[in-house]
């Protein structure tokens, strides 16, 4: 199966899992849940959800086991976007080419919609048709990736260094937590669904943080080279606010050269553990490096 066909297969599985989660956990009669659905079903790359399915598949697991885990990580990701867009955080009015949740439903409802998505993500794991050990591992991975030692910590650091001249080391720390931690949660949840061993989990962790860094470097570059229409969100706010990014630190060419080096190292290490089975994940990493939105 070629890469595009395989990606579409995982994407279809992820979309079906999200539709199922909406029916189970987000009743339409609730305004807050309608706002949550708006955030959850508003498009996007679904990279984290795809990673759950693709890792599970690579390790010989059952996609039905991965289904609820995939929905859970995407629900948590969308909660974070709903909150990040709020005026008290990043203050963005556009998300995925349409008004962000707080512009469509109001700030209070957007805040509650994020709360619902966060909470129901763990209920989705608890109700997954998987063995108890896999559910515990998935919940632990998601909590670790999203909380005070992961995504939330990364957002805290991002706000802290917003008006400061951050170093490359500080930028790496910010994005290891803000972006990489939840990507790692996704691959670990896929690994849990397939019953992966410790060595496999460590190799997947290195991969997750590698592609997370590449994703952020490319994001910084696109913020100065792309358009709002291409990205589906505002651009240029980082430079307007005097925020240090990989693009401002090294320039566009230097930042992309760094991303290329990280990507090569990441894929090489993954191949050492999984051999030819890692082909899809390597191609996904390359897609994240060369993406235009």
Predicted feature locations:
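N-terminal amphipathic/basic leader segments beginning at the initiator methionine
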Residues: 1-22
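Mg2+-dependent prenyl diphosphate-binding active-site environment of isoprenoid biosynthetic enzymes
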Residues: 6, 22-270, 277-289
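Short cytosolic juxtamembrane segments of multi-pass membrane proteins
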Residues: 291-293
């Amino acid at each position: 199966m070629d890469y595009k066909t395989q990606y579409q297969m995982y994407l279809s599985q992820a979309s079906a899992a999200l539709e199922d989660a909406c029916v189970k956990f987000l009743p339409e009669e609730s305004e807050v849940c309608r706002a949550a659905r708006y955030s959850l079903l508003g498009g996007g790359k679904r990279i984290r959800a795809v990673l759950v399915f693709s890792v599970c598949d690579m390790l010989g697991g059952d996609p039905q086991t991965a289904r609820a885990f995939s929905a859970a990580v995407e629900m948590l990701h969308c909660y974070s976007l709903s909150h990040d867009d709020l005026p008290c955080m990043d203050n963005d009015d556009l998300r995925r080419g349409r008004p962000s949740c707080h512009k469509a439903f109001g700030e209070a409802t957007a805040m509650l919609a994020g709360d619902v998505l966060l909470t129901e993500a763990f209920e989705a794991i608890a109700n997954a048709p998987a063995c108890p050990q896999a559910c515990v591992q998935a919940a632990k991975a998601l909590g670790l990736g999203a909380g005070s030692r992961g995504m939330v910590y990364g957002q805290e650091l991002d706000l802290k260094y917003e008006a400061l001249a951050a170093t490359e080391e500080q930028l790496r720390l910010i994005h290891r937590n803000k972006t990489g931690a939840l990507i790692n949660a996704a691959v670990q949840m896929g690994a849990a669904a397939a019953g992966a061993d410790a060595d496999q989990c460590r190799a997947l962790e290195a991969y997750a943080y590698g592609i997370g860094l590449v994703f952020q470097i490319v994001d910084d570059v696109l913020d100065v080279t792309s358009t709002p229409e291409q990205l589906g969100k505002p651009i240029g706010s980082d430079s307007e606010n005097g925020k240090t990014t990989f693009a401002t630190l090294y320039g566009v060419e230097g930042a992309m050269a760094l991303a290329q080096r990280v990507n090569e190292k990441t894929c090489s290490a993954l191949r050492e553990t999984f051999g030819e089975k890692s082909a899809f994940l390597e191609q996904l990493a390359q897609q994240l490096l060369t993406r235009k939105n």
